[in-house]
Amino acid sequence: MTDNMRVEVYWNLHKHLFSVRALEGPNKGRVISHSHGISLTDVKFAVQPAGRERVRREGKKNVHAFVRGRIANSGFEDCRENFSDEKITYNPYIYDTFVNAKTKEPIFKTDCVEMDVMLEDGKRYPRILSFEK
């Protein structure tokens, strides 16, 4: 993974980690990493409606929600200088889109996100923080 590379990231239900899929370069369309954490800039939140409806219909989760952006190995400090961090969540049984966890307002894009794995009661779950410049 290189700095500024376009990727899409999703929560891997089997590995309990983030899967990172390349959106450009020789590995375009392939998972290039599994990670406990990643930072992205120029971020868009995407939910594929057909996948979401399939989850609701069948009661089984599938990969259909992504955080897309550019890898920020360096330069992420710009986002953190004057940031207002907001926790972002998505639950296909409740929401149609990613939402601000506090206000429940839909969110479709942001300047930067920091994604990491949290441990609570012995269970791993994803945490996504949104940062606006």
Q: Which residues fall in each region the model found?
A:
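Detector for methionine-enriched segments
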Residues: M1, M5, M115-M118
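Structural detector for short beta-strands of small beta-barrel domains
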Residues: T2-N12, G69
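Acidic, low-complexity, intrinsically disordered interaction modules
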Residues: K15, S19-E120
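Short acidic DE-rich linear segments
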Residues: L129-K133
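Short beta-strand segments
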Residues: M5, G29-I32, R127
